[in-house]
Amino acid sequence: MKIVRGTKNISGPFPYPVVTLGNFDGVHVGHQILFRKAAEIALEKGGTSMAFTFEPHPLKIIAPEKVPPLLTHFHKKMELIEACNIDRVICADFTRQFADQRPRDFSKNILSDKIGVKEMVVGFDYAFGRGREGTIPYLKKMGEEFGFMVHVVEPFQLDGLT
């Protein structure tokens, strides 16, 4: 698995990029389902499975007083993601400027222009961009505009818990 640090270091084009996005702290079962779904689609299409994540934890920038202790440190998180057959991790520097991006700007500048995403895999409660303005319906709208498909993974239950 290749790890790319910083969005300025993304060097495509990539064969049929299938991307899942999130902080992924803890790399819990729900995250693993997203990674495996992205890897499965990429394998079927002869593409590249990607996880797009952030360093540091977004709350460290947005609301430092609310940042939880990390469940998984960076190197362990990378090991767990790799175990789910992800080909490439893009780790964005989560800065105030990054946090302030509007969802459309992120969709165009990063997802479309830099990565060339073809399919996205997100959880049912996913939101992105400034103030989490980018909802799943909005992401689907961006997919229509920029030419990518969005797969929404429904909640996973284990022992009756979501």
Model-predicted segments: where are they?
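Nucleotidyltransferase catalytic core that binds NTPs
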Residues: M1-T162
